[in-house]
């Protein structure tokens, strides 16, 4: 039986495949000091609140492009675990806002440290220049996604 002719793969097809694989890996055990897991959505939400300060459900909906019911569930879980609290709008608006707590900041720092240590283990044989180049490409990739999506992410 004849085999179909091989055509060179588009580079973006490789990117798609590799990002699909990346999404399935967990670099660290992702457990906080108290032994509970900080899931990805909690980490991302805490990161945004830490970077921008208190935000309402409406602001979070706009920032994440998610519906309010999803964010209500996520923020309710963070409230129950004491990682965020609800406060009146500091500038006098009607909507109450979510603010990261000290426990939330610590959980986020612990997660960041665990993730960084995991990446250090993965990239142990990479040169510092390769790690820096990879970080630059990831930032460029993410900022281009944000540009197309219209939702830039605050960076340090």
Q: Where are the predicted features?
A:
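C-terminal regulatory/oligomerization modules of transcriptional regulators
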Residues: 1-10, 129-156
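Charged, amphipathic alpha-helical coiled-coil/dimerization segments
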Residues: 76-136
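Generic structural concept
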Residues: 16-19, 42, 46, 101, ...
């Amino acid at each position: 039986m004849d085999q179909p002719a091989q055509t060179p793969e588009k580079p973006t097809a490789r990117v798609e495949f590799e990002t699909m694989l990346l999404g399935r890996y967990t670099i660290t055990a992702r457990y906080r000091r108290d032994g509970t897991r900080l899931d990805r959505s909690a980490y991302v939400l805490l990161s945004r609140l830490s970077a921008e300060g208190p935000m309402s459900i409406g602001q979070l909906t706009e920032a994440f492009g998610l519906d309010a019911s999803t964010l209500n569930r996520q923020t309710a879980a963070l409230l129950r675990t004491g990682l965020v609290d609800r406060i009146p709008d500091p500038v006098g608006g009607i909507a109450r806002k979510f603010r990261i707590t000290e426990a939330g900041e610590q959980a986020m720092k612990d997660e960041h440290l665990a993730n960084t240590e995991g990446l250090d283990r993965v990239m142990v044989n990479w040169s510092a220049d390769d790690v820096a180049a990879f970080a630059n490409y990831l930032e460029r990739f993410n900022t281009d996604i944000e540009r197309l999506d219209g939702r830039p992410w605050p960076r340090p």
